[in-house]
Regions:
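Catalytic core of membrane glycerolipid acyltransferases/transacylases, capturing the structured
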Residues: 21-41, 45, 52-54, 69-125
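N-terminal hydrophobic signal-anchor/signal peptide
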Residues: 1-8, 258, 265
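Short acidic-hydrophobic, aromatic-tinged amphipathic segments that line or gate anion-handling sites
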Residues: 61, 118-121, 211
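Non-catalytic C-terminal accessory region of glycerolipid acyltransferases
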Residues: 130-265
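A hydrophobic membrane-anchoring feature enriched in long, contiguous, low-charge segments
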Residues: 4-29
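Generic preference for hydrophobic
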Residues: 61, 74, 96-97, 203-205
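Glycine-rich helix-loop-beta junction characteristic of Rossmann-like nucleotide cofactor-binding loops
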Residues: 63-67
C-alpha cells in the first residue's frame, strides 16, 4: 500500500507541476513579479496538501519570527527535493543562486528568470563571479532572502556535516544576517528513492547570526548551531515516528548521541 501511495503521489506531484506551468504561464508573465510569485508558492502549498492527503506526511515550522524584514541569507540543511520548494510560502521574496543551465530549461527557466534568480557558471572565476556577487548585493538591498544550502548538495539524515566555505565568503561580502535552518525531510522523502513515508516532522528556523563576525568564526558558529539543532530534531523525529525506516547514517548518529547521553549520566 505504501508503494502505491508513493507512486500516486509522485505521479500527481509532477503532473501538478507540468499542468500548472502550462496553464498559468500566460497569467504568470502578465503579472508584476512579486504578485506572480504567488503562483509557485501556491504550487508548493498544493504539494503539501498532496503529501498530507496521499502519503500522510505533515510538518510544522518553528521560528518564523527569526526571519528579518531586511535582506538575509537563508541557510537550510539540504536532504531532499522537498526542501528546495517547501518553505517558499513562508518567505516573502526568496531568491536562489542557480546553475545557469537550469535557466535553459523551457518553462522552468522562464519562471526563474521572471523571479530574478541569479545564474552562475560553476566553472567560472574572476569577473563572472564578481557579477554574481553584484547581483546578490542588488537582491539583498531589495530585502530578499537568498537561499543557500551550506553543504552544497543533498546529504542523508545524520550524515557527517560537509559544509562549504563559500557561505562564509557570502556572509563577509554581503554583510547581512544568516538564518540557519534545521530539519529532516530526508526521513520522509529520501534522496535517490521513489518512496514517501507518512509521519510528522518539524522545520526549525534558528536565530540569526548577525553580520560583523570574522568569516572563520561565523563558519564555525553556523556549523555548531545548525548541527546541534539537527541532532535534537533527529532524536525527536525518530522518537515520534518509530515506524520510519532509517538510513545507516541516521542509525549511526543516533547511536552516537545516545552514547553521549549515557556517558554524561
Amino acid at each position: 500500500m505504501l508503494k502505491l501511495r508513493s507512486f500516486l503521489f509522485n505521479t500527481l506531484f509532477y503532473l501538478n507541476l507540468i499542468v500548472r506551468m502550462i496553464v498559468l504561464t500566460p497569467i504568470y508573465f502578465i503579472l508584476p513579479r512579486k504578485i506572480a510569485y504567488e503562483i509557485p508558492k501556491n504550487w508548493a502549498r498544493s504539494n503539501h496538501w498532496l503529501m498530507k492527503t496521499i502519503v500522510g506526511t505533515t510538518f510544522e515550522v518553528e521560528g518564523l519570527e527569526n526571519i528579518p524584514e531586511t535582506g538575509c541569507i537563508f541557510a537550510p540543511k539540504h536532504q531532499s527535493f522537498w526542501d528546495t520548494y517547501a518553505l517558499l510560502p513562508n518567505l516573502p521574496d526568496p531568491v536562489y543562486i542557480l546553475k545557469r543551465e537550469l535557466l535553459w530549461i523551457p518553462l522552468f527557466g522562464w519562471y526563474a528568470m521572471k523571479q530574478r534568480m541569479i545564474p552562475v557558471n560553476r566553472a567560472a572565476r574572476g569577473k563572472v563571479m564578481l557579477k554574481v556577487m553584484e547581483r546578490a548585493k542588488e537582491e539583498m538591498a531589495a530585502g530578499r532572502e537568498l537561499i543557500i544550502y551550506p553543504e552544497g548538495t543533498r546529504r542523508p539524515p545524520g550524515a557527517e556535516p560537509e559544509y562549504r566555505y563559500g557561505i562564509a565568503r557570502l556572509y563577509r561580502d554581503l554583510q547581512v544576517p544568516v538564518i540557519p535552518v534545521a530539519m529532516h525531510p530526508g526521513l520522509f522523502w529520501p534522496r535517490r528513492s521513489t518512496m514517501r513515508y507518512p509521519g510528522h516532522f518539524k522545520v526549525r528556523i534558528l536565530p540569526a547570526i548577525e553580520p560583523g563576525l570574522d568569516p572563520d568564526v561565523f563558519f564555525k558558529r553556523l556549523i555548531d548551531v545548525t548541527e546541534k539543532a539537527s541532532d535534537e530534531l533527529l532524536l525527536e523525529t525518530v522518537l515520534n515516528n518509530p515506524h520510519l525506516p532509517l538510513p545507516p547514517t541516521a542509525v549511526k548518529r543516533i547511536a552516537e548521541l545516545q552514547g553521549k547521553e549515557t556517558a554524561a549520566g
